[in-house]
């Protein structure tokens, strides 16, 4: 299929990037594929270097301190209530009290006395708004601003893909909400163009993942702690590593492999603040929790080398052929089609295996594959990608991130809050029922920005030659600017990649 340069450029930005911005279609029209490839070689691409953002250990400390303050608040409230009930049940001296409260003018001053007594009660400590949510919003703002500021957004799309592949949920509790943004910055962004094995190790040893999938509480049955405390194994993390992060569902592993692998990674935990204030919230290998002895996983024996036992299993999983095929299929479905060409999946699988999981080369293989460019534009953009594409097209950088978060919530894709460890779906069928909610979001965005932009101009910015005559005519005939913008954002050409 031969396309004119601007059509190819618009396709590149919608399929592989985060959507066009002002002038971006023309800027890459000479060589759209080359522009995307050059982004892979840009130093520091994909990283967020905002010095105001907290590290995961700092965020964990802030969340812990907040929980302690809330606990102190509850205890103080309970004590106040206990005192109130004690005072209420004290023997009444109504006559004396009435005489004491009688004013010279004969009026009863009981209410004034009660008010004075209430004012004398200890005041509740000023805990303030939720610290974990404040941290979450700052991280969300940094993520969205990075996406809006990206020239093309291909590497940011890769970050989003891997972040969803290795997802956690801010709804887990235990401080995970405060860690969600730092988790992505510390495990995904530094390795997005590195080696899959390095990303895998960073992810599985991060406190957010260990807390999300309960490995911080997993204890080897025959470990020192297991024998003393009679607590047991938690297989959640081991199962999701095999099923979702590496080999894929129903492939080469068995339930015995899950159990043995869970034993291997016992001791991979998070330092409690109450035990070690200086290192609380950090990853730690605790040998007291670790199941002793060798374990066999996917037919290979691993001697008990403590922490290195788990690292060795992860290293082998990272380069397993089933992992290569699983990752290749997901990447092709995310960027190209719900049912991608098998030749594309095979091409990506080969790249993964030939380069020992080099993710930059995997991304390069995707961009240079003919099938990735010739596939029809049938794939519905997931909510997050559509929201950012709409903001980029209109040139809006929201000063308040909360409406953007609310838009994600409305569309069923709350940021860093997937419904299950498998993450959000990339299949169009799973988002098609939410088009009425998209219309609500489109109308609201259009209402906010209509006075700032020309809808006809936005058509050229956002779609260029991809815009059909019917879409242009509908926008031209719209009754108002907001309606015209909403029609553009809901157009099939804009919705699909």
Language model: regions and residue ranges:
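Short, compositionally biased low-complexity segments
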Residues: 7-15, 131-134, 157, 230-236, ...
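Flexible, low-complexity segments enriched for small/polar residues
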Residues: 2-6, 10-24, 50, 57-58, ...
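A generic structural signal for nonpolar/aromatic side chains embedded in well-ordered alpha-helices
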Residues: 16, 28, 39-40, 188, ...
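N-terminal accessory alpha/beta regions
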Residues: 22-189, 216, 223
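A general structural motif at alpha-helix termini
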Residues: 29, 40, 203, 366-367, ...
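Active-site substrate-binding loop specific to GH73 endo-beta-N-acetylglucosaminidase modules
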Residues: 101-109, 115-126, 139, 143, ...
